[in-house]
């Protein structure tokens, strides 16, 4: 793309992004400032946990779109921009940006004829993802009877009800509405490639259009393996396996490289395995936590060529903390953003704030603690543990003037009395204390 076009593209992007920020659904998490895949997954998983904790059944439909960014029709996009109130001069500029593009195919030394590109947004452009978000914005207008998680072209409607029969019925209706929208908007939805994950282990089928889809025990969504029990054992075992393979490679080359290079490799290839959307799976079983800690300890021993120190001594040598404590700090940062109203609206639903301080100036606003019914889904949820962990953070850290200051201060914090099951002590006939 010519440099002059890039300047215009950035200018159009800035204006459109500001204009549409209040139009986009809070559930649209892709390609938006302050939102990411982790926020999308947190909202979905926490709603799932909340429903099961309340004795309800839950169901989700993982839809499939073929080449979504390449199939977007230009004329329909322009019509939608006009309907949203974009003025005529801006429409002409965007129309010129999209149209009069050509492509051809090369096979060996032979070329096809040039053909006009009538669909899709420019690949690798700044403006393309934003235009895609605008195009699918009205998809959320049909979600009166169900909710929907969305990140770019990954769209996952989900429902809940008093029994699995009502959930299947609602999910079929939601799926039909979503795929009708795809068809009416000239998007290529693949009903046969969809996946269903329900809160039941029963072998049931869901009819979406002309396809009959069998319930799956687990499926990958946005890079995270989600199972019907929400224990994330498959996902954590998978990333541990990948991390172990990286450690084997590091162990083989460690005699030939210095400590500084080993630390770089550790951060790039080991730590990165556990850095993707960790808040979705951080409160797992003690067994899985021990598995992660053993790998982490092995990694530090290889990095520092130290087979004598304890795990705690190795962490001190590395000036780091365990992966669980690192995740607690990451959660604290998200809580701070919500508390100071700098976080995305989608997390305000997960961590609601009690605003009684508005009427009683002696009290400070605090996160609402919700009643729970079960240990697995209630006590183990972010919505339950988040407010408790927030109370563990010292006031001088929580009163930071900005997110950057909070991030700097939280690096020194390790909870003294973390309420999660991983940090509690189990006593026979008593339970976790």
Where are these regions (language model features)?
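Short, conserved catalytic/metal-binding micro-motifs enriched in Asp/Glu and His
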Residues: 12, 64, 81, 94, ...
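Basic, alpha-helical interaction scaffolds
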Residues: 213-280
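Short linear motifs embedded in intrinsically disordered, charge-biased segments
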Residues: 287-433
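Short, conserved micro-motifs composed of acidic
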Residues: 173, 187-219
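Conserved, non-catalytic sequence blocks in retroelement Pol enzymes and Pol-derived host proteins
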Residues: 1-5, 29-38, 51-53, 66-70, ...
């Amino acid at each position: 793309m010519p440099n002059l076009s890039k300047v215009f593209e950035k200018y159009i992007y800035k204006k459109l992004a500001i204009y549409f920020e209040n139009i986009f659904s809070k559930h649209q998490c892709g390609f938006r400032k302050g939102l990411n895949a982790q926020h999308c997954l947190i909202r979905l998983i926490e709603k799932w946990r909340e429903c099961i904790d309340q004795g309800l059944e839950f169901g989700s439909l993982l839809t499939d779109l073929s080449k979504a960014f390449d199939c977007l029709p230009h004329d329909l996009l322009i019509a939608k921009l006009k309907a949203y109130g974009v003025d005529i001069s801006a429409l002409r500029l965007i129309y010129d940006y999209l149209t009069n593009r050509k492509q051809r195919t090369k096979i060996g030394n032979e070329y096809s004829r040039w053909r006009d590109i009538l669909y899709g947004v420019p690949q690798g452009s700044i403006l393309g993802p934003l235009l895609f978000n605008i195009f699918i914005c009205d998809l959320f207008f049909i979600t009166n009877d169900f909710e929907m998680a969305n990140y770019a072209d990954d769209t996952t409607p989900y429902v809940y009800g008093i029994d699995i029969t009502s959930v299947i019925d609602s999910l079929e209706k939601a799926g039909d509405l979503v795929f009708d929208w795809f068809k009416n908007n000239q998007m290529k939805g693949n009903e046969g490639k969809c996946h269903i994950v329900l809160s039941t282990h029963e072998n049931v089928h869901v009819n979406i259009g002309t396809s009959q889809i069998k319930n799956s025990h687990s499926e990958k969504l946005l890079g995270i393996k989600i199972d019907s029990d929400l224990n994330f054992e498959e996902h954590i075992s998978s990333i541990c396996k990948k991390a172990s393979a990286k450690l084997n490679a590091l162990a083989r080359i460690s005699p030939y490289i210095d400590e500084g290079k080993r630390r770089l490799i550790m951060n790039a290839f080991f730590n990165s395995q556990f850095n993707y959307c960790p808040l979705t799976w951080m409160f797992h079983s003690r067994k899985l936590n021990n598995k992660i800690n053993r790998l982490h300890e092995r990694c530090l021993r290889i990095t520092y060529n130290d087979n004598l120190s304890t795990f705690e001594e190795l962490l001190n040598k590395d000036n780091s903390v365990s992966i669980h404590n690192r995740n607690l700090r990451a959660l604290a940062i998200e809580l701070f953003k919500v508390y100071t109203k700098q976080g995305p609206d989608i997390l305000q639903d997960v961590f609601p704030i009690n605003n009684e301080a508005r009427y009683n100036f002696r009290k400070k606003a605090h996160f609402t603690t919700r009643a729970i019914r079960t240990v697995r889904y209630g006590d183990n949820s972010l919505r339950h543990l988040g407010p408790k962990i927030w109370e563990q953070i010292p006031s001088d850290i929580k009163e930071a003037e900005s997110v950057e200051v909070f991030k700097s201060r939280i690096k020194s914090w390790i909870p003294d009395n973390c309420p999660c099951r991983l940090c509690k002590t189990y006593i026979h006939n008593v339970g976790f204390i």
